[in-house]
Amino acid sequence: MVSAPGDHAGVSREGLRILPVTGLPEFRPGDDVAERIAAAAPWLADGDILVVTSKIIAKAEGRVVPAPVDPEERDAVRRALVEQEAVRVLARKGRTLITENKLGIVQAASGVDGSNVEKDELVLLPADPDASAAALRAGLAERLGVRVAVVVTDTMGRAWRNGQTDAAIGAAGLRVLHDYAGAVDGQGNELHVTQVAVADELAAAADLVKGKLRGVPVAVVRGLPTQEDGSTAADLVRAGEEDLFWLGTAEAVERGRREAVLLRRSVRTFADTPVEPDTIRAAVSVALTAPAPHHTRPVRFVWVRDAQRRQRLLAAMADKWRADLRADGLDPERIERRVGRGRILFDAPEVLIPCCVPDGAHSYPDERRQAAETTMFTVAVGAAVQGLLVALATEGVGSCWIGSTIFAPEVTRAELDLPADWNPLGAIAVGYPTEELAPRPPRDPGDGLVER
């Protein structure tokens, strides 16, 4: 990227330097971190950026937990702490958990760590790393009379990439994000969504001199101008469902399975967006996996794609309905009000008619068993209809099953040129909803579930 006005990469004339702070002791609960750093780095100057490993903050703040020395017992305690510090589990692989912790940070094991601590201890993250950064900054100003920025870091993995890097989990005294929106590069291109996580870049750069084995938990970045804007590391966290990848693959699949049926609802108002034919074909393919008696295929979905034929069918059904309602003694106003409820089938982008066909049905000499056979085939069609509605919902397509053709089977068969033994079982309006589908909570079964 060509430097633009306000580029985050500006450095002083002396260049950018990263300096280790050596000679620090092992930190224990109750230690004064500011006092120890001030003693080890009296050369700190205004404008320096102090980058501090979170572990020394956590130790000093008493976030150390006793643990057994036995490896298996120690791991059991560690896993219990991981669950304790987590608010949700995003992914798991073997014993490894990727969690969102109470700080909103997504990382392995909720930040619970057993490295660089005694073998009979485990350490948690600081309870409030931003507050810790602010307190350390104030403590150094009091002891050395300098204004420095502070970044508190922890090591994290990254999606899509091997290896780990340090990232900021606490910050004070600097702008943690640099927003390039509205800036123009050297070729005249306006930048729109580029935000640079400056605090994370500082954390990663400082780790080049801190390392993991040399006992150097603090480094100083010198020569990078900073601007204090009140932001903290909490501003780096993209929370929950705002993130495009807020669940692991297996967890996303599991959630999708749980919510698939709950996405279905009766949609009666549709957007103008056309539904791709392949989307409907795919949903029908799913629907045809529904259970059926005697290994038969008792359902056919008639897709009324010809607009004129649909108009003729719906008009003929409306006339039949009016005649039935007149025979019931309803006045014209009530009749038109009832018929008007069927406008959804005129307005829907697509309409499908589910039909029960008797292919493979058994014949019985008595009325009781023959009625049971008919019921069995009808139930199978209902299962396929539900499968279709759910399959459409999982693709973001709305639908509404309406019983209309059940009351006008002869008219439906005549207008659609269907065989005499095809029994239409309603109509399904299909189209994209005007509002995105969302799963609704399951109902309390109440008297819907009877246990014996």
Curated annotation (Swiss-Prot):
| Positions contributing to a divalent metal cation 1 binding | D113, D154
Which domain of life, per UniProt? Bacteria
For the ligand (GTP), the binding residues are: L24, P25, E26, F27, S54, K59, N116
User: Which cofactors go with this protein?
Assistant: Mg(2+); Mn(2+); K(+)
Q: Which InterPro entries match?
A: F420-0_g-glutamyl_ligase (IPR008225), F420-0_gamma-glut_ligase-dom (IPR002847), F420_FbiB_C (IPR019943), FbiB (IPR023661), Nitroreductase (IPR029479), Nitroreductase-like (IPR000415)
The pathway entry for this protein reads as:
Cofactor biosynthesis; coenzyme F420 biosynthesis
Instruction: Write out the entry's keywords from A to Z.
Output: GTP-binding, Ligase, Magnesium, Manganese, Metal-binding, Multifunctional enzyme, Nucleotide-binding, Oxidoreductase, Potassium
Which residues hold a divalent metal cation 2? Answer: T155
Q: Quick check: keyword Nucleotide-binding in the entry? A: yes
Q: Which GO terms describe its molecular function?
A: coenzyme F420-0:L-glutamate ligase activity; coenzyme F420-1:gamma-L-glutamate ligase activity; GTP binding; metal ion binding; oxidoreductase activity, acting on the CH-CH group of donors, with a flavin as acceptor
The GO biological-process annotations, alphabetized, read as:
F420-0 metabolic process
Details of cofactor binding: Binds 2 divalent metal cations per subunit. The ions could be magnesium and/or manganese.
Identify the residues that bind FMN.
R264, R265, S266, V267, R268, A292, G403, R440
The UniProt transmembrane annotation reads none
Which positions bind coenzyme F420-(gamma-Glu)n?
D324
Family of the protein in this entry: In the N-terminal section; belongs to the CofE family.
Query: By what name is this protein known?
Result: Bifunctional F420 biosynthesis protein FbiB
Record the organism: Nocardia farcinica (strain IFM 10152)
State the gene name recorded for this protein.
fbiB
